[in-house]
């Protein structure tokens, strides 16, 4: 029986015990991050349908209004209070409204099909989307967001894993520079004229040896390999430090943007209400002949733009909401992590 034990050699099992648990835990967290990415993508597709749905409502409303305006202009033209040019302008606007309705209906069907495909709904299931105007109320500080990200995100585990891998390469290179082997052996020895006599009262033979295997000349190979490993470790440390800075900057930007989007929703919602009221006033003034069709169209355009801006602000907020969850793996609304057994 012989036992050989290397001395000062690289021990891959020691490093695997440090690295592999990090790799496993990172994969668990990556799954949670992927789920939040899917939620974010679902939000984008939801608002694509929501936008096309609102556009169809706007186009349908404008078509009905333009049809009424065209009839009014026809009556005014017949009694000589408006010109042929204005009548043709209104008629052209009516034709464009019909085209807008057709295009909006097609866009809505296309977006609804994409949403169905993404969430796995069949063509027979009907649905109507409701605008998510109820915004969750919670505060997110930069320090808390950074702490949650450091504690939860797989990327920070990957930073530690990459550091350990670089250190293991240095340890491997150091282990190759000086090789020593400790050898121990135990055996039995005997002789005889017959095979059965060999196993009668054999002589014990014990040996303990220590040997060293040091290359006399390696032309600087091991020294160069160690220098390369140490240089790679320094480079890895630098890259990781930059990655940490970039990631923290991304979280900083996301938190600031999140607070700004709350304010943007309030502003665009108020603008939507004001633009709608202004259009109602302009429409009434047009009906009594106080303003012309051009000013009415300006009010109509501002009304439609304000509505779309409000929808876009809601979309930006909810996308940022799920981006923040993905970046920190934490649900700030319900105060709980998004992975693990908690």
PLM segments and residue spans:
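Metallo-beta-lactamase
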Residues: 104, 154, 236, 313
